[in-house]
Amino acid sequence: MTNHDFIVTTQWSVGRDEVGLAKGDVINESISIPSSLGGVGEGTNPDEMLVAAASSCYIISLAATLERAHFNDISINQESVGTASLTNGKFKMEQIKHQPKISVEASQKEALEKRLDKLLKIADNNCMISNSIRGNVDIKIEPYIL
């Protein structure tokens, strides 16, 4: 087994109406409670970062999966939506829905349509974030081939 450590440091001052900082090797972002939840809404927030992590992981995994399947001349634009709920006073991410729009050459479109379901599952199974949250968060994938 190989382990990889991903180190992020966070800073916060006392109180919910403050702005903190999340810092890693590349990330350097202000963080706060979103305004939709009564916070100051400056910078990003953990909910958005969770959806961004899931989305970026999935799109990278999907691109690699398509490349290995010899679909080389493609582009992917994806929107991901995280749906959270408040139940018994606790917030929980219930679902993350990925909607990848895959542009492919006309000559490869039919072949991709035939193999797409299997390739989507492979990509999801190779995504570390999907593997980490599966069972706690419902992951939906609604692809479009352009």
Residue ranges and their predicted role:
Residues 1-52, 60-146:
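Extended beta-strand/beta-hairpin segments
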